[in-house]
Amino acid sequence: MQAKYSSTRDMLDDDGDTTMSLHSQGSATTRHPEPRRTEHRAPSSTWRPVALTLLTLCLVLLIGLAALGLLFFQYYQLSNTGQDTISQMEERLGNTSQELQSLQVQNIKLAGSLQHVAEKLCRELYNKAGAHRCSPCTEQWKWHGDNCYQFYKDSKSWEDCKYFCLSENSTMLKINKQEDLEFAASQSYSEFFYSYWTGLLRPDSGKAWLWMDGTPFTSELFHIIIDVTSPRSRDCVAILNGMIFSKDCKELKRCVCERRAGMVKPESLHVPPETLGEGD
């Protein structure tokens, strides 16, 4: 009986083992092998500073772009303002230049008017006194019209008088207006027995008369009297007692030199009070 129980237990054990084995095999066949599970861990803490850094850089770039845009806008405004300012300054400069030119023209006109008045007053003083310190001529020279004259008492040939006048920075007497003729005649009357050379001559007998500066003579002002008493050629002209004669150029006559008068200085018109008292 015990042998039977033992046999049965053995069979059960065998069956149990078989069952366990089959169960295990069935479980092994039905259970799929589990794949290796990949762990999805949270982002590493090292990426967070990088992301923050990139974000910060982006913000800095945006701020920089905004600042550049603002600077460009300000520069554009300043550029336009500068252009407007330059245009305004150029306009003002043009207006100032025109005003300056206008003032210069007015100044020239005023200076001309002042000079005219000063010359007129000085001439009145000169004619009354016979000489005045306001005269535009140097001492011993006579003022008439626009010129200064000097009547020398030394007698020279026509050519010597020519070079003498040149040495005095002047030329020989030239009569091209009626006023000049009257002035020269009045001076010749004062020296009744003396004649004065003029700057009129002709290169050869029969040719045209020319003044010293090459200007041709016109007979409308005066007539040249041929002096038949001169033994040689009569190609130079002298004035005697208001009359015009042709003379031999080698004869000795007094010299008359003339040169352009200077400008009358308005300050020279001032008359000291003591001078006015003496006149009274």
From Swiss-Prot:
Record has Aminoacyl-tRNA synthetase as a keyword: no
Major localization listed first in the record, in broad terms: membrane
Bias kind Basic and acidic residues: ranges: 31-42
Parts of the chain on the Cytoplasmic side: 1-52
Extracellular side: 74-280
Molecular function via GO: carbohydrate binding; transmembrane signaling receptor activity
Keywords: Disulfide bond, Glycoprotein, Lectin, Membrane, Signal-anchor, Transmembrane, Transmembrane helix
Protein name: C-type lectin domain family 1 member A
Organism: Homo sapiens
